[in-house]
């Protein structure tokens, strides 16, 4: 009996040592190579490799020999319909004006996210006539009993000071609360006086609603934007604290229909760059809505055939935008996406992080469509 226990103990120890040995990938590799070497299918050489690799460290260099058209500057003048300036974006007026000259940007729409003094200050600082400034609602008033009246008064003042339109950010619909503590819905009736004033003054509303749908899902191995979300966990809306993605989209639809005389620009392709059938429905059912491509060519370039068909169908309702200051590196990627048929290239500049592990394909749009997207559609919308 004693010998039997000793035998089992030794056997168990050997098994555990084998398992411990096999835990390490390099040891498993040695066994495989030894096996195939004995079979005559391997030289027996054990290559050097890292046992583990973080997804953020995985930056493969493709062996695919890419064709590069070397098309970096747009073929036509550009109106940047979704630009940002100021301290957060590390810009200065002289630098921006020079970039507009160098990059053939005819007008630059600066979408401010605050109204009142902040709007007046940046408008005064960036006074190049090619820069058109949008204001925003003073949401810091919204929890006050007379907050809507204060927002309306500030908005009127900003319009008198030259604001060409209104920018609404994603906190509207996701986070903002009314005085009673309830979430402020996109189609909330308490905002009617404000939107009625926008309609009366015939101003444009550029609205950023929600974020990519992946931001509403768990940050785990199934999320293709995992790398982006672990870098920016504050962008995650996968919580009961926030409404669901579809709920916000439905509220936005009601808002668009509630104010049919207001011209809306649904920014970031309406957050439907990954679902073109929904983008098609959005434009079909809301003739007062346009969309821009800002910060969504990463999604659009993944399905170029469908995207090209969509751009052809809706060529009068798509605006050019890059979601930031005027930058040559970023512009060159947008130009490559819109104008060439290059394949399998990066959608981000070398000095910027990627959103997910994929590449994009160019659309090779025709000259008439390019002109509309680059500048004609925005000129019509803003009556330039």
Please tell me what each predicted stretch does:
Residues 74-79, 104-108, 127-134, 161-164, ...:
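Short, well-ordered coil/turn segments that N-cap beta-strands
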Residues 62-67, 92-95, 115-123, 149-154, ...:
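Alpha-helical scaffolding within the catalytic cores
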Residues 85-93, 108-118, 140-149, 176, ...:
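Acidic-and-aromatic substrate-binding clefts and catalytic sites of carbohydrate-active enzymes
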Residues 2-74, 98, 102, 106-107, ...:
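Mid-to-C-terminal alpha-helical segments outside catalytic/metal-binding sites
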Residues 118-235, 287:
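Active-site gating/metal-coordination segments in enzymes
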Residues 78-83, 95-117, 131-138, 164-165, ...:
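Divalent metal-dependent hydrolysis catalytic cores, especially in the metallo-beta-lactamase
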Residues 89-90, 240, 246-254, 259-384:
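H/E-rich (His + Asp/Glu) clusters that bind or coordinate divalent metals
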Residues 77-86, 208, 268:
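Histidine-centered divalent metal-coordination motifs
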């Amino acid at each position: 009996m004693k010998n039997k226990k000793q035998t089992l103990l030794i056997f168990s120890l050997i098994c555990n040592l084998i398992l411990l040995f096999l835990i390490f990938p390099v040891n498993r590799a040695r066994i495989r190579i030894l096996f195939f070497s004995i079979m005559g299918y391997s030289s027996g050489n054990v290559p050097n490799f890292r046992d583990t690799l973080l997804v953020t460290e995985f930056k493969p260099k493709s062996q695919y020999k890419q064709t590069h058209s070397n098309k970096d500057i747009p073929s036509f003048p550009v109106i940047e319909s979704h630009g940002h300036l100021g301290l957060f974006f590390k810009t200065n007026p002289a630098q921006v004006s020079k970039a507009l000259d160098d990059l053939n940007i005819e007008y630059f729409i600066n979408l401010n996210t605050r109204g009142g003094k902040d709007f007046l200050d940046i408008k005064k600082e960036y006074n190049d006539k090619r820069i058109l400034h949008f204001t925003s609602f003073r949401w810091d008033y919204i929890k006050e009993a007379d907050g809507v009246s204060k927002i309306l008064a500030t908005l009127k003042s900003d319009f008198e000071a030259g604001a060409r339109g209104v920018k609404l950010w994603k906190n509207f619909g996701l986070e903002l609360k009314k005085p009673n503590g309830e979430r402020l819905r996109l189609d909330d009736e308490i905002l009617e006086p404000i939107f009625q004033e926008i309609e009366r003054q015939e101003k444009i509303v550029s609205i950023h609603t929600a974020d990519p749908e992946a931001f509403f899902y768990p940050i785990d191995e199934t999320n293709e934007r995992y790398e982006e979300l672990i870098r920016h966990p504050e962008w995650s809306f996968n919580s009961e604290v926030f409404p669901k993605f579809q709920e916000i989209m439905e509220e936005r639809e009601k808002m668009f229909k509630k104010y049919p005389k207001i011209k809306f620009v649904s920014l970031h392709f309406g957050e439907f760059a990954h679902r073109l059938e929904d983008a098609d429905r959005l434009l079909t059912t809301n003739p007062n809505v346009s969309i821009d491509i800002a910060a969504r060519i990463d999604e659009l370039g993944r399905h170029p055939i469908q995207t090209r068909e969509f751009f052809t169908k809706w060529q009068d309702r798509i605006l050019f935008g890059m979601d930031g200051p005027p930058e040559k590196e970023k512009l060159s990627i947008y130009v490559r996406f819109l104008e060439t048929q290059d394949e399998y290239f990066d959608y981000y500049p070398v000095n910027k992080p990627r959103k997910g592990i994929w590449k994009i394909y160019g659309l090779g749009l025709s000259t008439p469509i390019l002109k509309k997207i680059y500048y004609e559609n925005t000129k019509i919308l803003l009556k330039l």
